[in-house]
Amino acid sequence: MSSSQFFILCIILISSFPLHECENGKSVEASNAAKTLCMSVNCDNKDRNLTCACCLAKSKNRCYSSKSECVADCKD
């Protein structure tokens, strides 16, 4: 590996560090307020009007009949 390739690799690694710092959302307070906890999805393929709210948290993969139930459980 030439020195110029090594230099470019170092720049890429150093520039990706701030992105990793903000990944969890705890380092920047504004990102916590804008974070969406639940996503509306279609619950039944036969009935397109039947929607559920599914939790987007990594540890919880549950869906609820209402968005308020989903938000209440996903906050924990």
From Swiss-Prot:
Coiled-coil ranges per UniProt: none
GO biological processes: pollen-stigma interaction
Keyword list, A-Z: Disulfide bond, Signal
Tissue expression profile of the protein: Expressed in flowers.
Disulfide topology: C38-C54, C43-C74, C52-C70, C55-C63
Secretion signal span: 1-22
Family: Belongs to the MEG family.
Name of the featured protein: EMBRYO SURROUNDING FACTOR 1-like protein 8
